[in-house]
């Protein structure tokens, strides 16, 4: 069975377009896996905030603030993208900013709380913008009865991409820890790995 059967796609949509769309999920899933879930959250609490009593709350507030920004601004951004046919351009711009902000996370050292906060808010807002913008392409790609199926292709690619990024990062972390390197040396490298895959 073909991976992207033509009958699931709208007329004129090429399979390589769907593949490219699904690969965006492959590329960006490392951000949530490594930055939000497995690596940087712990680094933020223990290193950037130096393990303070309020450190976990600070991380929660950073994520909440970035989510609130997205909630307040995404409707206007989406309307602009639709009205001016700028989805692809905005997706490219928000992706580039998210990648740059993820690279900036590599600059965070002990006590660099505000660098971490600013870079996290920017990266998470732009990641979320990218998620919404790429989802907006789905009706253009898939027939109405196949949207769930085509969306599932993107999700499955995303799982593979997230696991690849996490695998690369954890392999490096284990290598670095075996050599006695501190988190301030190996966690920044994992941010660069994540940004590179993105």
PLM features: what roles do these ranges have?
Residues 56-79, 100, 166:
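Central cavity-lining transmembrane alpha-helices of secondary-active solute carriers
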Residues 149-173:
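Glycine-rich segments within core transmembrane alpha-helices of 12-TM secondary carriers
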Residues 184-198:
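Symmetry-related core transmembrane helices of the 12-TM Major Facilitator Superfamily/SLC fold
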């Amino acid at each position: 069975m073909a991976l992207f059967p033509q009958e699931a796609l709208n007329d004129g949509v090429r399979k390589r377009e769907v593949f490219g769309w699904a690969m965006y999920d492959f590329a960006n899933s490392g951000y949530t896996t490594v930055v939000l879930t497995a690596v940087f959250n712990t680094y933020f609490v223990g290193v950037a905030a130096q393990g303070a009593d309020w450190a976990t709350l600070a991380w929660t507030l950073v994520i909440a603030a970035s989510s609130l920004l997205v909630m307040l601004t995404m409707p206007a951004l989406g309307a602009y993208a639709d009205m001016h046919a700028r989805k692809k351009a905005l997706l490219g711009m928000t992706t580039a900013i998210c990648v740059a902000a993820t690279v900036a996370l590599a600059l965070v050292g002990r006590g660099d709380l505000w660098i971490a906060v600013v870079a996290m808010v920017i990266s998470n807002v732009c990641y979320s913008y990218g998620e919404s913008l790429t989802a907006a392409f789905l009706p253009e790609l898939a027939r109405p009865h196949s949207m769930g199926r085509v969306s599932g292709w993107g999700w499955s690619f995303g799982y593979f991409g997230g696991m690849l990024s996490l695998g690369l990062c954890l392999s490096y972390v284990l290598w670095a820890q075996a050599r006695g390197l501190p988190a301030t040396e190996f966690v920044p490298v994992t941010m660069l790995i994540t940004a590179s895959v993105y």
